[in-house]
């Protein structure tokens, strides 16, 4: 019979070696260490305590299953009868510390969200029977509903105590595997709880009176980084076009507004929809810019006449130029070409009707 004072047959432990005893049913004088077959380790310190009892030390070569066996016919009793095969002794050597992985089906490690609680799963690399909720360290909240799904899987609910960073952790040497090895420290699980809605700090145009050839820089500043925002989809533009807004930090976004041609409208706004959120999933408000005006209808000439069109030497006539609306930048000396005469500088009281003498 093969027995051990250190472990029982079929056990798993982290003993660096085990003491073995080989007990014969009757006296034998030729049982030797070479009659013993082993796997997963080696024997040492073999000795006879009596003609029926022998001892040895078994040292495993590495983690895993080991066997100690005595085959049939390897020794004899005093009557020269060969032995029958012994019942094999089995032992598993495990010196590896168990590890625990912390995951969540609600969020990923490092995420930010507005979930009021998250589901946690603790998965051990091997079976343990003494892992408890008290082995888990948390900050920024509390655990509830702790339960074992199996000898390797445990679940719990984490509820944040307020907005901000939270951590879930398992320090080393909090529980053991079935071999008695203390666990190694888990990789910390981090989650940020955010249930405050993002706001719009400003939504402005660099120019609110746009004419032909003008453009304006549109600047949209959120209170925090946002996700899911696209100016092409989320901003409604009146009587103009807006380039796709860009950002370097997901907080401040800029684009260029170009007024549409042939438009005269004093009342225009940009409108922001509510389809964007902050990183926690909180939706922001709908806002608009201040009013901007557009005047891109080019002025036309209503009339350009001379009072007298049949002039003799020494005669003069009044020249009248009437625009469709007030103009700026007009100078008769620069803008009117005169043939066979001279034109005084034309003047106007309303920038619409201009007169001069030819």
Task: Name each model-derived stretch.
Residues 1-358:
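Non-catalytic beta-sheet/beta-sandwich ligand-binding modules that flank or precede catalytic cores
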């Amino acid at each position: 019979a093969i027995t051990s004072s250190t472990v029982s047959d079929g056990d798993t432990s982290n003993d660096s070696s085990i003491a073995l005893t080989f007990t014969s049913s009757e006296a034998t004088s030729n049982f030797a260490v070479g009659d013993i077959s082993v796997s997963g380790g080696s024997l040492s310190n073999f000795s006879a305590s009596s003609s029926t009892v022998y001892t040895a030390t078994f040292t495993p070569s590495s983690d895993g299953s080991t066997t100690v066996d005595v085959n049939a016919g390897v020794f004899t009793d005093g009557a020269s009868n060969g032995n029958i095969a012994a019942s094999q002794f089995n032992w598993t050597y495990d010196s590896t510390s168990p590890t625990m992985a912390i995951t969540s089906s609600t969020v990923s490690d490092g995420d930010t969200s507005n979930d009021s609680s998250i589901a946690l799963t603790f998965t051990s690399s091997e079976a343990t029977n003494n892992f408890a909720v008290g082995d888990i360290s948390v900050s920024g909240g509390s655990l509830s509903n702790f339960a074992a799904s199996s000898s390797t899987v445990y679940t719990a609910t984490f509820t944040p105590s307020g907005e901000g960073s939270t951590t879930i952790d398992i320090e080393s040497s909090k529980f053991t595997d079935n071999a008695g090895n203390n666990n190694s420290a888990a990789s910390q699980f981090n989650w940020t709880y955010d249930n405050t809605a993002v706001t719009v700090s400003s939504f402005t145009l660099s120019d609110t009176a746009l004419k032909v050839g003008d453009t304006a820089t549109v600047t949209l500043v959120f209170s925090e980084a946002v996700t899911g925002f696209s100016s092409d989809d989320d901003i409604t533009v009146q009587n103009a076009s807006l380039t796709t807004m860009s950002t370097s930090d997901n907080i401040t976004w800029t684009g260029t507004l170009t007024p549409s041609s042939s438009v005269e409208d004093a009342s225009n706004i940009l409108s922001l929809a509510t389809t964007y959120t902050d990183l926690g999933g909180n939706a922001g408000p709908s806002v608009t810019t201040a009013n901007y005006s557009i005047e891109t209808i080019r002025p036309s000439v209503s009339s350009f006449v001379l009072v007298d069109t049949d002039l003799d030497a020494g005669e003069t006539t009044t020249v009248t130029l009437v625009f469709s609306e007030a103009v700026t930048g007009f100078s008769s000396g620069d803008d009117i070409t005169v043939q066979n005469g001279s034109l005084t500088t034309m003047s106007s009281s309303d920038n619409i009707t201009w007169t001069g003498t030819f």
